[in-house]
Amino acid sequence: MKKTRILGLLFAVVLCIVGCGSSAEIKVDTLSISGNGAATYTIISDFSEPYYNLEELKSMAQKEVEAYGTGVQISSAEVTDGVLKFQYTFDSLSHYSRFMETSCYQGTVAAALANGYKADTKLTSAKGGSLTMSDSSIRERNLFIWNEEVAVRCDGSVVCYSENLSLSGKTDVQPKEGSVGPYYVVYK
C-alpha cells in the first residue's frame, strides 16, 4: 500500500524547511540510523493552520502502521509553535524500506563493494579532500546508502560522503538542494 496518503498530507503542509543547526536538534526531515539496525524517521513540517488536526493525523498514521504490521511504531507526534514533529521508529532498516517503499543499504564499505556497489563513487572527506569507495582507508568503515531526499543522522562521526550531500554536523549529512540519490555516507 502506498504511503503517499500520509506522507502527502505531511509534506503538503510544509511551507518552509530550514537547514540543520546543532546535531542535537532535528530541524528537517531526518532518518536517524543506529548500529543495531534500528532507525527513527523524523518529519518536521509547518502545522500552523487552524484547520490542521494533530489527532486526525495521528489516527491516519496509526492506521497505516497497523496495516503494515510489526516493526514500526509512532514514537511521537507533537506540535510546538506551529511546527509538527512526527516520529516513526523502525525495528530495522528493512522495515523502514518496506514501510516507506524505498531502498537503502547499511553495512561496511567492503561488503557494499562485494555486493556490486560502484568502487569509483566519488566521496568528499569530512576533513577536506576527496576519495572513492575503493580507498583502502575506509573499507572497514560503516556505510549507509539511500535514495530519498532526506537528511541522515549517523550513530557515529561522518568520515566521508557523496558529492550530492553536504555535511551539516559531526554526525549529520543532508542532500544538496535539487540533488537526487543515491546518497552515500561513510561513518565511524
Task: Describe each model-derived feature in a short phrase.
Residues 1-3, 58, 158-159, 185:
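Generic hydrophobic, helix-prone segments enriched in Leu/Val/Ile
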